[in-house]
Amino acid sequence: MEEATHGRLGRPTAHLLLPCRSDSVPVVRALLSRDLERWAVPEEVADAILLASGEAVTNAVVHGAWGQQDSAMVIRWAMAGGRFSFSVQDRGPGFDSSGTAMSRRAHPSQNRGRGLYIMHALMDRVVVDSGLNGTRILLEKALDAGAGRLGRGL
């Protein structure tokens, strides 16, 4: 499952290949939480990273499997130069990521549809690359003191 703990140049990194199933979400959360603690990421920042990355993985589980029981997702995270990055790649049908849904707050009566909004609110950079062969979400967060922000706020 976990393929690496250090990437090229000795940078802390993780690379996972997991099934697109709901039981993969707590696995990612536990492993990522362990790494954030090991890297001494401040608790408030770690909480923001865990919430945003959990939303990204949940989106891959919900939308990426697309009825395929053997569908998998590739998850990576790394720490380099005071920046944390996290990505999840699924093989789903993709979606139109150009809409305003990514920055729009969901109506309070909705049970779903807040994931991309939450990711944008908590992370410094969110990139969504979606097409017919799947979707990749990249999240980035500056960890240097004063270099980033906790988020834009919900």
Language-model features, listed with the residues they occupy:
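Structural signature of the histidine kinase catalytic ATP-binding subdomain
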Residues: C20, V41-E44, M79
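Short, small-residue-rich loop/turn micro-motifs
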Residues: R29-L32, D90-G92
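Conserved beta-strand-loop-beta-strand hairpin that lines the nucleotide-binding pocket
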Residues: M1-H15, V61-L154
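STAS-typified acidic loop motif
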Residues: H15-V27
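Hydrophobic residues in the alpha-helical elements that line and stabilize the ATP-binding pocket
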Residues: A56, A60
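Conserved short strand/loop->alpha-helix "switch" segment adjacent to the catalytic nucleotide/phosphoryl-transfer site
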Residues: A30-G54, P108-Q110
